[in-house]
Design a protein with these regions (language model features):
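Short amphipathic
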Residues: 6-13
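Intrinsic-disorder/low-complexity, polar/charged segments enriched in Ser/Thr/Lys/Arg/Asp/Glu/Gln
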Residues: 7, 34-38, 70-72
Length: 78
C-alpha cells in the first residue's frame, strides 16, 4: 500500500475474487476515518463487490473508472 496525503493506495492487481474485497477490508481497518482508499484491481467483479460492500457498511463508494483492463475504485472510510 502506498499513501498520498489523505489517500491510501491498495494494489490488488492480479487478485481473483474474493481477494480484492478481503484486501480492501483489511486496508480499511488500517486507515483513519475520513481517509480515502484507492483500490487498483484487475478482477472484473471488484467494482460490483465493493459497491455492494459499501452499501452494507459505513464506508462511501466515491467512484470508479477503468483504464485498459484495470479498475480504479475509491472508497471513503466511514
Amino acid at each position: 500500500m502506498s499513501e498520498n496525503h489523505n489517500e491510501v493506495e491498495l494494489d490488488a492487481i492480479g487478485q481473483k475474487c474474493p481477494m480484492p474485497l478481503l484486501s480492501t477490508k483489511k486496508a480499511l481497518s488500517n486507515i483513519e476515518k475520513g481517509q480515502i482508499l484507492k483500490i487498483i484491481a484487475t478482477d472484473k467483479n471488484a467494482v460490483k463487490d465493493l459497491k455492494a460492500f459499501c452499501e452494507y457498511t459505513d464506508h462511501e463508494f466515491i467512484d470508479d473508472r477503468s483504464e485498459n483492463e484495470t479498475f480504479i475504485i475509491r472508497i471513503l472510510k466511514g
